[in-house]
From Swiss-Prot:
Homodimer. It is an enzyme of class 6 (ligase). It comes from Anoxybacillus flavithermus (strain DSM 21510 / WK1). The lineage of its organism: Bacteria, Bacillati, Bacillota, Bacilli, Bacillales. NCBIfam families: 7-cyano-7-deazaguanine synthase QueC. This is 7-cyano-7-deazaguanine synthase. HAMAP family: QueC. It holds the Pfam family QueC.
């Protein structure tokens, strides 16, 4: 893979930034694509652009505002509360988001001569999102190859990692402090450690605390 080119689906959050560092290690050339889908916090796009610039990665922003029209949800509408009722998907789930993002990323990748796609979806901490499952990614990979007559490979470095293990990977890539201080995961639009209260921040902090405690314990032995 080292001699090939990859396109990373990039939001500027913890997971996709970790994947960007992973891709830079594994591929000769890396580009990033961010989607503007009228997300609640436009800062996400600015953060993604800033990180890409700092890492010297070519960055494309694609307009996906139709998602806002088709699938109102808590990530695009400030009047919808961030919550998860028993037996239902979280209000932050956007129908078709990863399907569309990866499909458009594939079109872009083919135009740029890349066949590798990298995404930070994860089944371990996937919060019930059906489009973060490994079976979906494998199915979409086959579909994209058939639809475009092109041999794409979708990479999911975080698929079987929990949040603590994702922090560990960032650390192994020499990017832990970068990811901690410069990414935007918070649903309330606060960079770095975030608000500490929304589901994304709680998951992120729990994972970081677990990893740092494990690392500390390993160093004591």
């Amino acid at each position: 893979m080292k001699k090939e080119k990859a396109v990373v689906v990039f939001s500027g959050g913890q997971d996709s930034t970790t994947c960007l560092f992973w891709a830079k290690k594994h591929f000769a050339e890396v580009e990033a694509v961010t989607f503007d889908y009228n997300q609640r916090h436009r800062l996400e796009i600015d953060v993604a652009a800033s990180i890409a610039k700092e890492l010297n990665v070519s960055h494309t922003v694609l307009d996906m505002s139709l998602l806002h029209q088709l699938a109102p949800n808590a990530l695009t509408r400030s009047d919808i509360a961030i919550e998860q009722k028993e037996g239902q998907l979280p209000s932050t789930f956007v129908d078709g988001r990863n399907l569309l993002f990866l499909s458009f990323a594939a079109v872009l990748a083919k135009q740029k001569g890349a066949r590798h796609l990298v995404t930070g979806v994860c089944e371990t901490d996937f919060s019930g999102y059906p489009d973060c499952r490994d079976v979906f990614i494998k199915s979409l990979n086959v579909t994209l190859n058939l639809a475009m007559d092109y041999q794409f490979v979708i990479h999911t470095p975080l698929m079987w990692l929990n949040k603590a293990e994702t922090w560990k990977l960032a650390d192994e890539l020499g990017a832990l402090e970068f990811v901690r201080n410069k990414t935007l995961t918070c649903y309330n639009g606060i960079i770095a450690d975030g608000c500490g209260e929304c589901p994304a921040c709680v998951l992120r902090k729990r994972g970081l605390d677990q990893y740092m405690n494990e690392k500390k314990g390993a160093n004591v032995r």
